[in-house]
Amino acid sequence: MADSDDEYDRRRRDKFRRERSDYDRSREREERRRDDWSDREWDRGRERRSRGEYRDYESRSRRERFSPQRHDLSPPQKRMRRDWDDHGSDPYHSGYDLPYSSSAGGPGYGPPQPWGHPEMHVLQHHGIPIQARLGNLHQVDLGTPAPIMKTFKEFLLSLEDTVDETEAVKRYNDYKIDFRRQQMQEFFLAHKDEEWFRSKYHPDEVGKHKQESQASLRNRLSAFMFLMEKSWLNEVQLDIAQSPAIIKVLDAAVIKMEGGTEIDLKILDEEEEEAKREAAKKEEAPVTETEKVVTEEKEAPAKPENDKEDESEEKPVKPQEEEEKKVEKKVEKEEPERETRKPGTRKRKRSGESDDGSDSESDTETASPKPKAETPNQNGRAEETPKKEEDTEKQKEKQKEDTVKPRPLHKTCSIFMRNIPPNISKAEITALCKRYPGFMRVALSEPQPERRFLRKAYVTFDRSVNIKEICWSVQNIRLRECELSPGVNRDLTYRVRNINGITLHRPIVRNDIKLAARLIHALDERAVLWEGEQMVLAQNPILKNITDYLIDEVNAEEEELLFSAGRTPETELPKDGNPTEISVERDDKLIKVLDKLLFYLRIVHSVDYYNTCEYPNEDEMPTRCGMMHVRGPLPPNRVSHGEVAEWQKTFEEKLAPLFAVRETLSEEESIKMGKKDPEQEVEKFVAANTQELGKEKWLCPLSGKKFKGPEFVRKHIFNKHAEKIEEVKKEVVFFNNYLIDSKRPALLEVKPLQPPVGAAGQALAAGLLYPHQGPPALLPYAQPRPPVLGYGGAPQFPPNPYGAGRGNYDAFRGQGMYPGKPRNRMMRGDPRSIIEYRDLDAPDDVDFF
C-alpha cells in the first residue's frame, strides 16, 4: 500500500532530523557553558554572580547527567529555567533557604548546611555535637544559652552622651558585678537539686561526703602501714626497670584495701610464677623450632636416592600399617585381661548368665574394671568397697575445698558510660546495676561544663562475671529517657610510665625529698589523718628523721685550704668535654628514702608525684591504684647546671596546685557578690507567709489558719513550722557555700568572636557578626535560626541605605563570602579572577560613616 502525501511530506521534513538534533544538542551544551561564565556580559554576570555557586554547580552536573530531550515532533526547545533559580534583583539571596532560616517558609531542599563559611569551623567549640555541626539542629538539645557580657564599647552605646569617662567606668564595673551575681543566682537555681551540686555545697551532704572520704583515707593508710611493716617497700625502687615489682606492690595495696588477707596476697606470687613460665615457654619455642630445622637439613643429604624412592612408594601404605599396629596392641592388652577374668566368668555362668564363648570387645572393656574391685574381697561384700572409696574421695575433696584459695581481689571488670546527664543520681545507677551478679561499686566523674555538665560513669563488677553479657543487657535499658550507651572498659595496659631520667641526679633527688615531705605534711594536715585523742598532731612515722637527708654536706674547710694554696679541689677538676656539664650522679640511699615517701603519696593520698597530679575518687574506680609514674633510665649524655635548675623550677611550679588550699572569697567580696544573711532571709520567709485578708484577718498559707494580727502569724510560724525555718537557714548556708568558693562551677564565659580581617585590610564588621549571627550553639533551642553563611550563601545583614551596588557588591564580590578571600578547592566555581574597573581614589562605603 502506497504512502499518503502527508506521510511523504513528513519524511522529507525529517530527512536531516538526526543531524539537526545533534547540532542542537551540541549548541545547547556550548551555550550552557558560555552562560556559566559570568564575565561574558557585565549586566548578566553581575546578576548571576549573586547566586550561590553551589547551586550552579549542582544544577549543571544534574543537567549534564541526564539524557537530552527528544526533538522528534517539535522544534528545539529553549532551556527551561527553574523557578527557584530566579531571584530577581535581590543581590543577597543565598543558594538555599536554610531549614532554620527565619525567611524560609518551610524546610529547605538543599543538603545540610554547615554553621557558616567553611573556614568558620575553626572558630567553633569542640563541645558542639556532630549533629549540630552537620546542620541537624532538630536532633540536638543545646540547652539554655549562656548570656554574653557586654564589652565596654557596647556598654557605652547604652549610656547617655552626658556621662563622662570616670562615671562610665564606674557604671561598667557595677554592671559586671550585677551580671556575675545574676549568673551565679541562675546557676544555683538550675543545679541546686542535682546530686553532684548538693554533695559539694549542701551542709548535710557535705558532712556525709567528708565522713566517707575520711573512712577511705583511713583504709588506704592501714593498707600502706601493713605493706611497710611486712617489708614490701624495702627492695623496690621507683625505676622503670622494676615495673613488675612496682605493679606487685600496688596490687598488694589494692588487695588489702578490698579486705584481703595474707593468703590472698599469695596470688601475686602465683601470677609472677605463671608469667615466668610463659616467658620461658616463649623463649624455648623458637629454639626448638630452629633445632628441628637444623636436624632436618642434616638428615636430608645423608639419605640415598634409593631410600627416597622407597619412601615415596611406602607413603600411601602408612595409614593401613598404623591401623594394623593398633589392632595388634589391643589384642596383646586383651590377652592378660582374659586370663585374670577366667574365675569371674565361670561364676557368672553358674549364676545363669549368658554362656556365649565369644564376648565382644566392648563387653571386655566395660567389664574389666569391675573384677579389680571385687577380687580382693572374698566374703561376698564386693559392692561395699567402691562406696568406701567414693566416701574417702569426697572427704579429700572437702578438705581441699576447706583450704582457702587466694582470691584475685585486685582484678575487676567494669563498664564505662560516657554521657550521664547531671540529673541522674549515683543511687539510680547503683539500683540499676545491682541486679546483676558480681556488682561492686559505681564511680561518677565531675560534671564537665564544656559538655553540658555531662558525667562519666564506671560500674565495677567482680572478675568472675561475663562482663559482655551484662554490658549487652544494660545497653537496652533507658534511664529517665536517656540511653546509657555502655561499653566494656579495658584493663590498664601501661600502669607504670617513666619520665626523664634526670630525676636520678642527686641534687634533684634531695629537692624531691624536701617537696614530697612538705606535700605529705600538707595533705595529712588537711585530712586530719594523724590527730590523736588529745587533739595533738602526732608525727607521721614516715617523716621521722627526714631532716637528716635534707641537709647537704660540703667540704668547705678543705676547699678553703686548697684555694688558699692556689690549688683547685680534685672533685671540681673539669673532666673531658664541656666544663659546664656534669654527669648524672646517683645516690641509692637518698633514692630509697624518696621512694618510700612517693609510695605513701600514691597509696594513701592518690597523688602521682612525678605526674604532678591527684587521681580523684580513686576508691570508687575499677582499679583503686592504677597508674604510677617513675624515673626513667639514666640519660646517655651529660647534663648542664642550667638544665638541672630549669627542671627543678618547672617541677615546683607544676606541683604548686597540690599545695594550694581551697580558696574562698573574702567577706567584703562575698557581700559584694550577694552573700545572704540567714536572719534577713528568715524575716523575708515570715513576711512572705503572712497574708492580710482584711481588717484584723491574717492568714498563714503554710497551715491555712487565720489570725487577728501579723504578730500571731509570726509566732505560729516559729512554733509550728520550725522545720521550715531550718530549711530556709540551710538554703542560705547552701548558697553561701557555693558563693564563697573561688573555683565554683559555672557556665563557660563566652566571648564574642572577633571578625577576621580580609586580604584588603577590610574587617568583616561590614556584615558578618550582627547580633543575630552569634555562634549557633549560643542561640536558644527551638527558635527560628537566621540564615547563616553556607556554600555560596550571602551574608545576612540589613540593606545598606547608601545603597547602590558598588560598595556592597565589590566588598563581597556578590557571592556571599569573605572579602578578598582567596578561592580554594572547597569553594566550587570559576577559578579565574573577575576583570572589572574600579576607581581606586573613590572611598569605600564603609568610610561614609
UniProtKB/Swiss-Prot annotation:
Gene3D superfamilies, sorted: 3.30.70.330
GO BP: primary miRNA processing
Biased composition (Basic and acidic residues): 8-73, 276-306, 314-342, 381-405
InterPro entries linked: Nucleotide-bd_a/b_plait_sf (IPR012677), RBD_domain_sf (IPR035979), SE/Ars2 (IPR039727), SERRATE/Ars2_C (IPR007042), SERRATE/Ars2_N (IPR021933)
Biased composition annotated in UniProt, kind: Acidic residues: 354-364
Ranges in coiled-coil conformation: none
Keywords on record: Cytoplasm, Nucleus, RNA-mediated gene silencing
GO MF terms held by the record: nucleic acid binding
Subcellular localization, as worded in the UniProt entry: Nucleus, Nucleoplasm; Cytoplasm
Region Disordered, annotated ranges: 1-90, 276-409
Main location: nucleus
Entry superkingdom: Eukaryota
GO cellular component: cytoplasm; nuclear body; nucleoplasm
Subunit: Interacts ncbp1/cbp80.
Function: Acts as a mediator between the cap-binding complex (CBC) and the primary microRNAs (miRNAs) processing machinery during cell proliferation. Contributes to the stability and delivery of capped primary miRNA transcripts to the primary miRNA processing complex, thereby playing a role in RNA-mediated gene silencing (RNAi) by miRNAs.
Family label: Belongs to the ARS2 family.
Protein name: Serrate RNA effector molecule homolog A
Gene that encodes it: srrt-a
